[in-house]
UniProtKB/Swiss-Prot annotation:
On the 2D-gel the determined pI of this unknown protein is: 4.7, its MW is: 36 kDa. PANTHER family: ACT DOMAIN-CONTAINING PROTEIN ACR11 (PTHR31096:SF16), ACT DOMAIN-CONTAINING PROTEIN ACR4-RELATED (PTHR31096). Residues 48-63 have a biased composition (Low complexity). Keywords: Chloroplast, Plastid, Repeat, Transit peptide. This is ACT domain-containing protein DS12, chloroplastic. The lineage of its organism: Eukaryota, Viridiplantae, Streptophyta, Embryophyta, Tracheophyta.
């Protein structure tokens, strides 16, 4: 597949964030986030993918064609990974006030993960500059299905953001891992963790999780859901500063989750999320 030449023009934002809001849960088009419960082979979301190396930016001194403004107020960094809006591509939206450039180095880092940016758009609103990337796998031309690779995309983008905008490091939980300056404030996991499950039509439920962010969180959430034989049909994973917000469309044997199963899922997630240092083998 030919590499895309990015020529996105600035425009006013219209419906920038395709996120499912906490008060409106309208059905979206069927997405291709592969199911996790024992489905047919073509629908399997693999959890055993080999570890993916997260490429780092080539230079921390460059600004990736963006603004390196060091004002007192650092905007909240946001990275949204959306598997709902486009049936053919994974949509990623990146925001850091008005400081981001064209992210060409970030797109090169994504290419090193075996991915292709097939479309890019840029828009402006009162919160700043929003860059959207439509991403597919180079090997298949299809959207990303593996949670490990989705997490690698998230970490790659955040790593590059911190490399080019080190002032964002203290605003991100992952700044303690990738950045020169860890967060100045710590999030109380017990207070920050919220888990809600809603009915979302005749064949699925909507799981909404908000908690303190940490590396590998997306993969951990998917694994916990899979361990209960619940299927993730599609979803979205947002990184907003020190917090992470997941919105997953889930089902059990093609049906919404009954109340008892909702409670099992919520308890399992809460147990894990409130023990961030728990090793996988002890769960």
């Amino acid at each position: 597949m030919a590499e895309m030449a990015v020529t996105a023009a600035l425009r006013p934002c219209s419906g920038v964030s395709p996120a499912v809001s906490g008060t409106s849960h309208r059905r979206r088009r069927p997405a291709a986030w592969r199911a996790l419960a024992p489905p047919p082979p073509h629908a399997g979301l693999r959890l055993s993918s080999p570890a993916v190396r997260v490429p780092r930016a080539a230079s921390s001194a460059a600004v990736e064609d963006g603004s390196s403004s060091n004002t007192d107020t650092v905007p909240t960094p946001k990275v949204i990974i959306d598997q709902d809006s486009d049936p053919d591509a994974t949509i990623v939206e990146i925001t850091l006030g008005d400081r981001l450039g064209d992210l060409l180095d970030t797109m090169n880092a994504l290419k090193n993960l075996g991915l292709n940016v097939v479309k890019a758009s840029v828009c402006l609103d009162s919160t700043g500059k929003h860059i959207k990337l439509a991403i597919t796998k180079l090997s298949t031309g299809r959207k990303i299905g593996e949670p490990e690779l989705l997490e690698a995309v998230r970490l790659t983008i955040i790593n590059n953001m911190i490399q080019y905008h080190p002032e964002a490091s203290s605003q991100l939980a992952l700044g303690a891992t990738f950045g020169p300056e860890p967060p100045t404030e710590l999030v109380d996991v017990d207070i920050a963790t919220h888990i809600d499950i809603y009915d979302d039509g005749p064949d699925r439920s909507l799981l909404v999780v908000e908690t303190a962010d940490r590396p590998g969180l997306l993969v951990d959430l998917v694994k916990i859901i899979d361990d209960i034989n619940i299927t993730v049909q599609s979803g979205e994973f947002d990184t907003e500063g020190l917090l992470a917000k997941a919105k997953f469309h889930v089902s059990y044997r093609g049906k919404p989750l009954i109340k008892a199963l909702q409670q099992v899922l919520a308890n399992s997630l809460r147990y894990f999320l409130r023990r961030p240092t728990t090793e996988e083998g002890s769960y």
